[in-house]
Amino acid sequence: MNKISLPKIGIRPVIDGRRMGVRESLEEQTMNMAKATAALLTEKLRHACGAAVECVISDTCIAGMAEAAACEEKFSSQNVGLTITVTPCWCYGSETIDMDPTRPKAIWGFNGTERPGAVYLAAALAAHSQKGIPAFSIYGHDVQDADDTSIPADVEEKLLRFARAGLAVASMKGKSYLSLGGVSMGIAGSIVDHNFFESWLGMKVQAVDMTELRRRIDQKIYDEAELEMALAWADKNFRYGEDENNKQYQRNAEQSRAVLRESLLMAMCIRDMMQGNSKLADIGRVEESLGYNAIAAGFQGQRHWTDQYPNGDTAEAILNSSFDWNGVREPFVVATENDSLNGVAMLMGHQLTGTAQVFADVRTYWSPEAIERVTGHKLDGLAEHGIIHLINSGSAALDGSCKQRDSEGNPTMKPHWEISQQEADACLAATEWCPAIHEYFRGGGYSSRFLTEGGVPFTMTRVNIIKGLGPVLQIAEGWSVELPKDVHDILNKRTNSTWPTTWFAPRLTGKGPFTDVYSVMANWGANHGVLTIGHVGADFITLASMLRIPVCMHNVEETKVYRPSAWAAHGMDIEGQDYRACQNYGPLYKR
């Protein structure tokens, strides 16, 4: 795998530059504030790959232009991707701020009475607003004593939320989206918009025809020893579901083995195309060994591939999961049907949480009345207002079965660095692999089938592009729901029972698109969505504001909405502010 240095967090202690007593009295307190911030972030955060987060602190406190420039030189040489400026006192506003136009930045002004940290915070934010370089404000709710070195809970929450989102921004910058194929069945998300990736995400698009995948398979441009390992792993761990095809379309054992072999090869080759593989250089394929520096990918599949070759279901499901024949590892981000916009939502979720993402069709709204009519069952609990059936043949991560457990024994999806091999095995054991339905996939394949455990908090997201407006983000926090087995079976067999299912109940607010479950479904902007573990909508909102992507729909509590301070100057309604600010500032990487 090609190694590119991970972005670091820069910590900028700023100080009142007046000597003869003022600066000298503040040096230790200011630098300790920077060190405490760095300690918090390195203890609480990891990169999505699992590596520890590193912080870089300015060599000196920053009182003016010269020290700000020296700090910037250090940060530029150490791949600092976001900055946090900290101070307990008055400093010189525009002389000390971080002026990099694309680097996410926050300022923590200490809430104390001895020195006016809050006054500097306000002055510096005014400079940021006037110069068109938005910054996030961090200011504790309660006054602290000057010698109090603790970080209050509300300050910690903002520091961590800012840092998670800022690391996501910095990690995406300079990477690529691998578009393997073109437009799938007219799905708009697979009309890959290069300008969106370049201007809003700082990414490139690598467009590769699906014949490149065919070439790699046919010419054995892969690690043959690894293929044997993958086959042995599948033989040990795969349970096969019923073949629902008519007799004339069912494959014999030899044909089924060939389909499995090619499905695993597809996973290997797509992975190698994304990140490279030094083993390919060993067999003389140096160019192919480099990969495309892809942090996310999409596979068109339907129909130009799937009408004659095995579909991408197995490859996508395995790649998006946190484990394979090599053990537990970081999940990849691979969007089925090359839905690049759902792929971006997956990428955001993975970068914010380090977890696998569940790709799904937003297939059916089931009202309580309809379920009672069809099954005789009356919905209650989380499901009492109705549920949405999330189901897709393709790339739902097997982690989505929720056979992993948190510290209290509850079902969940964990960051890959916390997953045990036993938990990975449990997810595999909960999954059946069903022969693909011939009417959809003439080339065959295997679709994973599992049922997500109930009562698990999830956040469903989706990015859409609106002509004349640009990208927008949708967010719906809610829970998975467990239905009685007979009820699930009746409902599931009305669609395609060979695919993975999550029954989802969004949290309702009684207003707008969250008036009821029907309205959530009716306002969803496309046929696909992504499930990310936990109620993490607030993190998505912060990330979107950094990228200048307005949020058109969410059910996050207003007190958790955290955006740059300049948004407040764009009107009195916080969602209207978001639209006006994103339009005013334009995409983060303007083109």
Curated annotation (Swiss-Prot):
InterPro entries: Fuc/Ara_isomerase_C, Fuc_iso_dom3_sf, Fuc_isomerase_C, Fucose_iso_dom1_sf, Fucose_iso_N1, Fucose_isomerase, Fucose_isomerase_dom2_sf, Fucose_isomerase_N/cen_sf. The active site is at 337 (proton acceptor), 361 (proton acceptor). Its cofactor is Mn(2+). Coiled coil: none annotated. GO terms for biological process: D-arabinose catabolic process; L-fucose catabolic process. GO terms for molecular function: arabinose isomerase activity; L-fucose isomerase activity; manganese ion binding. Pfam families: Fucose_iso_C, Fucose_iso_N1, Fucose_iso_N2. Its EC number is 5.3.1.25. It is an enzyme of class 5 (isomerase). It catalyses: L-fucose = L-fuculose. The keyword Transmembrane helix does not apply. Keywords: Carbohydrate metabolism, Cytoplasm, Fucose metabolism, Isomerase, Manganese, Metal-binding. Pathway: Carbohydrate degradation; L-fucose degradation; L-lactaldehyde and glycerone phosphate from L-fucose: step 1/3. Mn(2+) binds at residues 337, 361, 528. Converts the aldose L-fucose into the corresponding ketose L-fuculose. Belongs to the L-fucose isomerase family. This is L-fucose isomerase.
